[in-house]
Every structure is written in C-alpha cells, then in structure tokens.
Regions:
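Loop-to-helix entry and N-terminal half of a specific, functionally important transmembrane alpha helix
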Residues: 37-45, 85, 358-387
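Transmembrane alpha-helices of multi-pass inner-membrane enzymes
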Residues: 62-68, 372-419
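Transmembrane alpha-helical segments and their membrane-water interfaces
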Residues: 67-74, 96-150, 356, 382
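Alpha-helical transmembrane segments of multi-pass inner-membrane proteins
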Residues: 132-162, 179-248, 352-357, 377-381
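A membrane-periplasm/extracellular boundary helix in multi-pass inner-membrane enzymes
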Residues: 147, 153-156, 245-285, 293-301
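A conserved mid-to-late transmembrane alpha helix and its immediate loop/hinge
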Residues: 179, 222, 296, 323-357, ...
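Long extracytoplasmic/lumenal interhelical loops at the membrane interface
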Residues: 274, 281-293, 297-301, 305-338
Length: 419
C-alpha cells in the first residue's frame, strides 16, 4: 500500500468513514484506496471528464505537465513509434489545416496529438481491475449527471453559460438538458455510452449490488437521454443494445430482450418531451439535408486532401451556406475535413484494433467485452448518420477510455474478466 501523507491524495484517504459514504455503499471506495499513487492521479484525471470542458482541459494540461516533470513523458513519446499511421494522420491533419489557414482545425489536430500521448500512458497503466473501476465510476458519474439533467429540465438550476469564454457562446437549447457537456447532443451520446456500460457490467458481475446498480443506472440514463430531447440517440441506443444482446447471449433470450429494449426505446422516443420534437422532424430533416448538400459542395472543391478538422465551420462562407460547427454527419464531415487521402489514413489506423477484436471473438468467454466494443461502435455509427457528437472533448474521451482497452482485454484471461 502506498503512503499518501505527503500528497494531496491523503485528504481523500484520511477518513473513509466520513467521506465518500455513497461510493463506499456501492463498493468503489475500497478499490479506489487500493490504487497506486500514479493510478490514483490518473483516475482523478479521468473522472474530471464530468466537469465543464474548460475545467477538464485545464486539469488535462496540468496532468500532461506533471508527466513531463516526472520524466514519464520521455518514455511515452518513444512509445508513440508503435502508432506510425496514427501519427502520420495527425501530422497530415495539421499540415492541411495550416495550408487552408484553418486555425481551429490546427488546434483540434494538436488536441488529437495530446490525446494520443494521454491514452498511450493510459494503456500502459491499465489493468482489468482498474478498467472495471473506471467503468463503474463513469456509471456512477452518469447517475449524478442525470440528476443534474433533471434539475435543468425542471428549471431548478440554470444551464451553464459559456459567454464568458466568447460572446458567441450563448446559452443554446434552453429547454434541453446538457449538464456539463456543452450541448444536448453530446450529453445524449454519453448517455448512450453509459447505458452500454451498464449492460456490460450487469452481464459480467456476480455481485448483486452491482447488478441492481446497473439496472438503476441504465434507466436513470434513459431519463437523462429523454431530457436531452435528442431524437437521433434513441435509434442509436436501440441498435447498440440489440447488438450487445445478440453478441453476448446468442439465443432466443437475446431476441425477446431485444424486443423489450425496442419497446422501451420507442416509449421514450414518443414520450411527452421528445414527442414535441418529433413533431418538427420534417423541418429538421430539411435543414439537415441542406447542411449535407453544403458539406458535399465543399467536399467537391477539395476532394482529395480536405482542409482539416471543422472544415465546414471554416469554409461555409465560401458557398453562402448556413453557419454550423460541422456537417451534421460523421460520414460527410470526415471526408469533407480530411479528404479521400485522410479518410484512407483513418481507416488504416483502425486495422490493428479490428484484428485484435477478431482474435478475441474466437474466445466465447470474451463475448461481453466484444459486445461492449461493438455496441459503442454501433451507437457512433447510427448516431453519426445525423450528427457528429463524437467529435467533442468529453464524448470522444469516454469513447477512447473504452476502446483503448482492446489490447489489454486481448491479453486478459477469461477467468479474470468477472467480479
């Protein structure tokens, strides 16, 4: 056990009976106290994802500076050579952003590089027990977020106002919950991820308290998702849940459970809050199609190379298109921003993790973790038809927390994958 009296961590450890009683009641406190000093500060960095993005980015920068000061950064940078295609893609993204004078795209490319550094270190420190602790904590944090979403929905608390960062950052979506995630659609996809995590933890634990908590957290996140009024998220969560069930169970139970998930999803989709927005679906689709047409028009101007991340926001005045941050489609925005060349590089960087997943699929005991990965990808694929919610600091971070565990879970014995 590491001695923490000379660190800030001692504040957390010194009186577990008085602090963290809720965490203790759901079995997290003992696991947190068992972390090494390095893992504890990594854990704190990870859970700060539930703070507003500007606070998270500040802590993220401090954490990377800490890695530099402690000498960890040198080893991490050397290890990046294991990801040549990804490095080349980030360099490519930076260069085309500079050529196009797309400075926001350059900032986004730099953030990609910093994420690569962080998640390389994350993979180095990750164990299966630590990964499960992270998932359980994210699920716990999502329950608190849903509680805040409820307060937002009933206007008991005011929404976060980002105008102090820029006059353009007004309070949008007055009647839709977004919690600390800047936009209801970003919070919506995070709810989807958390529901998938609840499915995974429920099917891989023998602990009764954790099963009960997963069921509770799943429904709480459904209500949080409802408060976002995110129409795209419900087809995504239905598809993700069905993929998870069929990957994991593979019998008639999966079919009937899928019918149940579909029914619950539809009931929420046409509930009072979302039903109001469903009534404006025709006009919203017309707006989406106009954005997609503008995105494709911009793509045709530079089909091979692209102009870097957030190309739509950078280039929309050229064709007198309406202002939007992106092309409201994962698929259109990707080819628009990175061109054919960059999209091919992205696809090539995905080959290694796909191969690892295919290897894992040969072991029947690893169906649940494969189901988690596939359900995440399904949520992104379906949600991405109408939006680009993954390309945000917090939603992208949570996605990578899960997907970057693929090399670890490939090595983990099936007997060690439950608790």
């Amino acid at each position: 056990m590491v001695e923490y009296k000379d660190s800030l961590a001692f504040i957390f450890w010194r009186n577990p009976e008085q602090k963290g009683s809720v965490l203790k009641s759901i079995g997290l406190l003992d696991k947190i106290r068992g972390l090494s000093k390095k893992d504890f500060f990594l854990y704190l960095m990870i859970i700060s994802i539930f703070l507003p993005f500007y606070l998270f980015l500040g802590l993220f920068a401090l954490y990377l500076i800490g890695l530099l000061v402690t000498g960890e950064m040198k080893g991490i940078i050397k290890g990046l050579a294991k990801h040549p295609v990804l490095l080349f893609f980030i360099a490519y993204s930076s260069i085309i952003s500079i050529v196009a004078k797309n400075w926001l795209g350059l900032v986004a490319s730099l953030l990609m590089f910093l994420f690569l550094i962080f998640f390389s270190f994350y993979q180095k420190r990750l164990t299966h027990a630590f990964f499960r602790l992270i998932l359980q904590t994210i699920l716990f944090g999502s329950v608190l977020s849903a509680a805040f979403a409820t307060l937002e929905h009933f206007q008991i608390v005011k929404k976060f106002n980002y105008a102090f960062l820029s006059p353009n950052m007004q309070v949008w979506h007055q009647n839709r919950a977004e919690v600390t995630f800047f936009n209801p659609n970003y919070y919506g996809i995070i709810c989807c991820f958390c529901i998938m995590i609840a499915f995974y933890l429920f099917t891989t634990t023998k602990l009764r308290w954790l099963k009960v908590f997963c069921v509770l957290a799943g429904f709480v996140n459904l209500f949080g998702l409802n408060f976002t009024q995110n129409r795209t998220a419900f087809p995504a969560i239905i598809a993700g849940a069905i993929i998870y069930l069929f990957t994991t169970i593979k019998n008639w139970k999966a079919f009937w459970l899928s019918i149940g998930v579909f029914a619950i999803g539809l009931s929420f989709l046409f509930s009072s809050d979302l039903g109001v927005r469903m009534g404006t679906l025709d006009s919203s689709m017309e707006e989406r199609i106009s954005i997609w047409d503008a995105g494709m028009a911009l793509f045709k101007q530079n089909p091979f190379w692209g102009e870097g991340p957030l190309t739509y926001m950078h280039s929309y005045p050229r064709i007198n298109a309406p202002y939007h941050e992106h092309a409201h489609s994962l698929y259109i925005d990707t080819i628009l921003s990175y061109g054919i060349v960059g999209t091919i590089l992205l696809a090539l960087s995905s080959v290694a993790p796909v191969r690892l997943m295919m290897d894992m699929s040969q072991e029947s005991g690893k169906r649940p973790i494969i189901g988690l990965y596939l359900s995440f990808l399904t949520v992104v694929a379906v949600h991405g038809i109408f939006d680009l919610a993954l390309f945000w600091i917090q939603s992208g971070f949570i996605f990578l927390l899960v997907m970057c565990s693929i090399p670890l879970e490939r090595r983990t014995l099936v007997s060690d994958m439950t608790d």
